[in-house]
């Protein structure tokens, strides 16, 4: 009985430590995957990289990071669904971004300035690297 009473606190401690490790590590894996995909995409010489996209970073100052990621996902979806280029990479990036994004957002193209897909991906890569350095 004495050994069991000593093991219970140790097991609880291990369980708590493991859960903290797993939750922190999930953030790292998703961000690592996003950054890896962004590195691959931005190094490509592809005509799709010059396609016009809404400048999702020109949003109001009160926009949250999650809303910005949501808008970026909308633009990525628009590109890979309508232009049939870089689908594998843009689709994967969209899926990973959706795990970091809010569920609903809007991109009002009439009021939004435009940029290129390359610029969007480069800015997104910078943001993700900063986020990863804090994770």
From Swiss-Prot:
One of its GO terms (molecular function) is cytokine activity. Belongs to the IL-4/IL-13 family. InterPro entries: 4_helix_cytokine-like_core, IL-4, IL-4/IL-13, IL-4/IL-13_CS. PANTHER family: INTERLEUKIN-4. The keyword Secreted applies. GO terms for biological process: B cell activation; immune response; interleukin-4-mediated signaling pathway; negative regulation of inflammatory response; positive regulation of DNA-templated transcription; positive regulation of macroautophagy; regulation of immune response. It is found in: Secreted. It holds the Pfam family IL4. The keyword Signal applies. Glycans are attached at residues 62, 96. SUPFAM superfamilies: 4-helical cytokines. Keywords: B-cell activation, Cytokine, Disulfide bond, Glycoprotein, Growth factor, Secreted, Signal. Disulfide bonds join 48-85, 70-105. SMART domains: IL4_13 (SM00190). GO terms for cellular component: extracellular space. This is Interleukin-4. Participates in at least several B-cell activation processes as well as of other cell types. It is a costimulator of DNA-synthesis. It induces the expression of class II MHC molecules on resting B-cells. It enhances both secretion and cell surface expression of IgE and IgG1. It also regulates the expression of the low affinity Fc receptor for IgE (CD23) on both lymphocytes and monocytes. Positively regulates IL31RA expression in macrophages. Stimulates autophagy in dendritic cells by interfering with mTORC1 signaling and through the induction of RUFY4. Residues 1-24 form the signal peptide.
């Amino acid at each position: 009985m004495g050994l069991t009473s000593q093991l219970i606190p140790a097991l609880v401690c291990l369980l708590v430590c493991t859960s903290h490790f797993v939750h922190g590590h999930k953030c790292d894996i998703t961000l690592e995957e996003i950054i890896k995909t962004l590195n691959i995409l931005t190094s490509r010489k592809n005509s799709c990289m010059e396609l016009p996209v809404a400048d999702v970073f020109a949003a109001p100052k009160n926009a949250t990071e999650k809303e910005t990621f949501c808008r970026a996902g909308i633009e990525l979806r628009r590109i890979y669904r309508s232009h049939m280029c870089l689908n594998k990479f843009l689709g994967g990036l969209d899926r990973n971004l959706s795990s970091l994004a809010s569920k609903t957002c809007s991109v009002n193209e009439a009021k939004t300035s435009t940029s290129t897909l390359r610029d969007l991906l480069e800015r997104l890569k910078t943001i993700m690297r900063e986020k990863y350095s804090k994770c």
